[in-house]
């Protein structure tokens, strides 16, 4: 990240979210009073990502979607992000029952999972890359990415 502009792909933000949550848990378990700093960093990254890396309706949109230029790795990046955003959200919910600490992420996860189900599913319940729809193509990595989003949403209810 440079200032308020995010550079890179979703998996970059997703992997670091998961790592920061793990470091927080290790530090907290050892009694480190500065452990919360790692959650604060994770929240700053998550806040930037869910604000800057979305379309006008708040749905994750990979930069390579515009020209159908995502390779087999790129089609999984959003799923990696959602998996780790879900991990952050569940950790924040466990730490503090006040939904102001996790509610924004919960809503984002559910909104994206619902969009995939409603807008990015074919008649055989296969999923594409464009979570706002329509289905562009189906393959294992697109399916895996969508399933990561659905799994992240399970604790919060989804697929209305």
Protein language model regions, located:
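CBM-like carbohydrate-recognition segments
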Residues: 8, 37, 43-160
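Oxyanion-binding "anion nests"
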Residues: 15-31, 38-54
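Active-site cradle of extracellular carbohydrate-active enzymes
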Residues: 1-23
């Amino acid at each position: 990240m440079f200032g308020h502009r995010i550079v890179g792909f979703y998996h970059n933000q997703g992997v670091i979210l998961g790592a920061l949550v793990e470091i927080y848990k290790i530090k907290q378990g050892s009694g480190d009073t500065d452990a919360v700093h790692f959650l604060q960093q994770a929240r700053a990254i998550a806040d930037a990502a869910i604000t800057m890396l979305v379309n006008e309706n708040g749905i994750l949109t990979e930069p390579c979607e515009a020209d159908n230029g995502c390779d087999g790795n790129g089609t999984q990046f959003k799923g990696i992000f959602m998996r780790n955003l879900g991990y952050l959200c569940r950790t924040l919910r466990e730490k503090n029952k006040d939904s102001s600490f996790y509610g924004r992420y919960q809503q984002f996860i559910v909104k994206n999972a619902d969009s995939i189900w409603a807008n990015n599913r074919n008649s055989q319940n296969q999923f594409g890359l464009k979570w706002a729809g329509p289905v562009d193509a189906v393959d294992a990595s697109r399916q895996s990415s969508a399933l990561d989003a659905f799994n992240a949403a399970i604790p919060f209810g989804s697929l209305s």
